[in-house]
Every structure is written in structure tokens, then in C-alpha cells.
Amino acid sequence: MLDFLAGNGEENITRFEAEIVKNVCKDTYILFLNKKNSVILNHIKRNSNAGLTEGEIAQGIVAPQDFCNRASALTLGNENLQGTGIFNLSMDEYNALNLSSEEKELVKPFYTSTELYRYYGNANNKLWVIYTTSKFKNKSEMKAYPNLKAHLDKFIQVITSDNKPYGLHRARDEKFFRGEKIVSLRKTAEPYFTYTDFDCYVSQSYNVIKTERFNLKFLTAILNSNVIKFWLRYKGKMQGDNFQVDKEPLLELPLIVPTELEQAHLSVLVDQMITAQEQLNSAISDSDKKFLQQRVDILDKQINTVVYGLYGLTADEVKIVERG
């Protein structure tokens, strides 16, 4: 500290000049940026012409009792119940319930990082979620679903949902889980965004982006680009070296909407990336994995090159962005 105050050891010290305006900085993070990074971030912001809105982003399902934990198993007096599905079900548990066609309509395909990758989402789910909205706080609503009712009744003592005994704690607007959308893991070592066009229900570990104002494949490319990663690192929220891609940072992203031709070009590259990621995910031999990883890396470079151009970054700025 004394060396710092005396101006010694400058080679190990980074100094920042800051102008803090109280009314602007109130209730926000104060970020320390070196001059080069600040110039690039301002350049990115100036070239942005779009952004996401509140109504286009939703957090995933909140279900405190997804599976039975040890404490709940002890409360229920049966340690063997630990790991058993409550609102979430494994494939075996789903099949064992012998659900009627009406009951199956209430159980939705549930996805985790096991199926959701950068760009590519595998539609073959391994888990299910009993998707009961707040209306199931009324116990009579469950009468039409006897097998599901019997299942949840076994855990009624430990269900703490605001909509107990049968409703999820926070089910969310179902439109976000249906059809074309982008799914984003909230806490991650590397930000990644998954394009899905199938019904895809996720937990609160994810945010879901659904909008008709963007070509969603194009938007997936922008969100997975080095430009947005750079922005999130220095203008978003970080927990140590991990990115915390919450709703607020997503709302502040400096997005861009170019011509339809430019959007179409990136969309084609995204289609190729999704195919390559799918093939990589199912590859068995080391040689196939190596070849497909090289293909993914090439496509990544092509996508980033296009995005750098859209934001008007210079060659020197690109070098800084790629160093992170």
C-alpha cells in the first residue's frame, strides 16, 4: 500500500482515471476500464442500433423441489427417496407413472446443459417437468390428473412452492418455452447461447430470449460472438472469472440489425455451425472429433469476422477483443 501511495512499483500497478457522476452511477456497478478497452466499448456502443426489451427475456422455471434432496428425504422418513424426482422426472420415472394422454399434456420436455450447447440444442430430452401453473394452487384442479396427483402427494410434506401443493413455484409464461427461441445459461465460464426451434423447458439457471424483431439465427451469431463476450466481460456482471449473464446485462447489450442480406449470410453460417456441433456431439472416433472441432473453429472465425465488420472494428481493435 505504501509503495502504491508513493508511486513505486508502477510496473505492477494499473491506474484508472475516473469521473464518477453520482446520479448516473446510483444503483449500478462502477467499472474500472483501461483506456483502450473503454474506446472499443464506446465504439461498439456507437455502432449499435438495437437492443432487447423486458418483454423479450424471461428466466426459466423456479421449482425448489425439482428432485428430493437429503434433507427432504429425512423429513419424509425414507433416505432412499434422495434423488427421486418431484416436479422433475427422469425418463424411467416418467414411464413408470403410466400417465394418461391428458396427463402427458401437463408434463413437458425439460433440458439442461446435458442437451444445450453453444449454438446447438439436442431435442432428445432425458428429463421432464410437471408444468403446473399457479391455478394448481386450487387443489381441485389436480383431480383430472390422478397419477400425477398421487405422485406429488408422496412429497406434499416437503413442497414449499408459493402455489403448493401442486403448482410450480414460478412456472413463467409458457410462450417462452415453445417454438423458436434462444436459451442462455446464466452462470458460466464462457457465455454461450443456444438456438432451439423445439419446445424446450428450462430451469432458472437459464434465461430465454424470444422476439419477433430479430432473425433468431442471426441474433444467436451476434450473441455468441467475441464482440458480445468482450462487452459482457467489461460491461456485464462477473463473478471472479465466471460470467453472470442475468437479465440486466442482456437488456444492456449493444445489438445491431444490418440489412436482410447480411442477416441471411450469418444465418447460413449458424445453420452450418449447428450441423457441425450436432455431428461433433455424436462423433465417436478421435479423428472425427478432431476434424469436426476444426470445422467448428473455422465457422467460429468466419462468424466473428462478419460481426467485427458489422460493428466497424479496426484490425487493432479486433486484436484487443480477441485477447479478451
What are these regions (language model features)?
Residues 4, 11, 23, 114-117, ...:
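Phosphate/oxyanion-binding loops and surfaces in catalytic or ligand/nucleic-acid-binding neighborhoods
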Residues 48-51, 106, 147-155, 256-324:
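Non-catalytic DNA-recognition/assembly elements of restriction-modification systems
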Residues 1-8, 129, 136-137, 265:
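Short intrinsically disordered, low-complexity coil segments enriched in acidic
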Residues 2-43, 49, 322:
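Charged, often flexible domain-edge or linker segments that flank or initiate folded functional domains
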Residues 29-261:
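Polybasic, glycine- and aromatic-enriched phosphate-binding surface used to engage nucleic acids
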